[in-house]
Amino acid sequence: MAQRALWRPQATPGPPGAAAPPGHRGAPPDARAPDPGPEADLVARIANSVFVWRVVRGDERLKIFRCLTVLTEPLCQVALPDPDPERALFCEIFLYLTRPKALRLPSNTFFAIFFFNRERRYCATVHLRSVTHPRTPLLCTLAFGHLEAASPPEETPDPAAEQLADEPVAHELDGAYLVPTDTAPESGACCALGPGAWWHLPGGRIYCWAMDDDLGSLCPPGSRARHLGWLLSRITDPPGGGGACAPTAHIDSANALWRAPAVAEACPCVAPCMWSNMAQRTLAVRGDASLCQLLFGHPVDAVILRQATRRPRITAHLHEVVVGRDGAESVIRPTSAGWRLCVLSSYTSRLFATSCPAVARAVARASSSDYK
C-alpha cells in the first residue's frame, strides 16, 4: 500500500476565527497532510470502471480529464462525500496526465494525479490506452494498466481553477435508443429497475417496455420518456408529487454534467411512488386518468403490477407485467398495440447505471454473491 500517495487537504492557514472563502474545498500543497493510501489495484479498478471521461484541457504538456459517476462502494473507500446534499450520492474525479522527463517513462505511460471530489488525491504512474467518442473528440474512454503509486509533486494543481463546460456534447437519448426485441436469453437472470424494466445480468443491458413513436406522439407536449414506468407514475401519482414522490437526483455521466433533466426523465428508475417506496402493487389512479387510454382499451380505477421484485423475469407479454381493474373489480388486460419490449445498447445501459443511484444500487445488489 502506498502510504504517501493519497492526500487529504487541510484548512488553509489564516487568522484565528477566519472563515474559509465561499466554495473553498482545497488547499495549497504545503497545507496537505498524508492519509493512508488505498491499494493501487483499488484505484485502478475505480479508474477502469469510469464510463466516460470528458476533456477539460488538452495542452501538449498537460492533459486534464473529468468525470462524474455514482458513488459506488469502492469509491467510498477513497472519496469523501460531497457536502452538497444534491451531490452526496455522486463522485467527481479529475485526472491530470503529464510525462515529466525526469521520470523517463516508457511509451504510453504517464504520471497521473487523481482528485476524488476535490478532497483527496492519488498520484501514480500508469500505462494508458484511449478510445475517442465517434462523434466528438471531447469524450473518451480510458483503459488504465500497470498503475503504480508515485510520490506527489511539489506543486499540486487545483481543480477549482479549471473552466468547466456546462453543455452536453453528446446527445445519447435523442436518437432511437429503444430497440424492439423478442425476449432475453436467461430471462430470469435479471433484477427489477421499475415496472416493466429490468437489468439483464449476463448481458449487462437494460430491457424495458416502451411505447412506439405513434403512441408516444399522444403523450403530453414536452414529454420525451416512453417507458412503462414513466407512464404508470403519471397515471397513479398525485399531481404535484413532492415529498417521498419527488424525483431523485441524476447526473449525466456521458457528458460529465450535474444537471441532467433528459436522463432523469428517461431513466428506468422512474416508477409509481407507492411501488418504489412502499412496494405496493395495486395502485389507484390518482394522477392523469386521461393517459390510461394509452395502455388500456377501457376505463380503469387502478393498475395492478403483477411481478414481484424478488423474483423478476423479463417477459415479452405486457399483461404479465401490468393489468387494470375497473369499478366492477374486473381485470382489464392492457392493449398490446403501440407497446414493445425493447433493449438498450450496452452504452446507453451503462449511462443509466452510472448516472442513477437507484439503478446502480440495484445492479450492485443483484451482482453480489449474496443476492438471492
UniProtKB/Swiss-Prot annotation:
A Pfam family recorded for this sequence: Herpes_UL16
Record's keyword terms, sorted: Host cytoplasm, Host nucleus, Late protein, Virion, Virion tegument
Cellular compartment(s): Virion tegument; Host cytoplasm; Host nucleus
Transport listed as a keyword: no
Biased composition (Low complexity): 20-30
Protein name as it appears in the record: Cytoplasmic envelopment protein 2
Protein role: Plays a critical role in cytoplasmic virus egress. Participates in the final step of tegumentation and envelope acquisition within the host cytoplasm by directly interacting with the capsid. Upon virion binding to target cell, a signaling cascade is triggered to disrupt the interaction with the capsid, thereby preparing capsid uncoating.
Superkingdom: Viruses
Family to which this protein belongs: Belongs to the herpesviridae cytoplasmic envelopment protein 2 family.
Region named Disordered: 1-38
Main location: virion
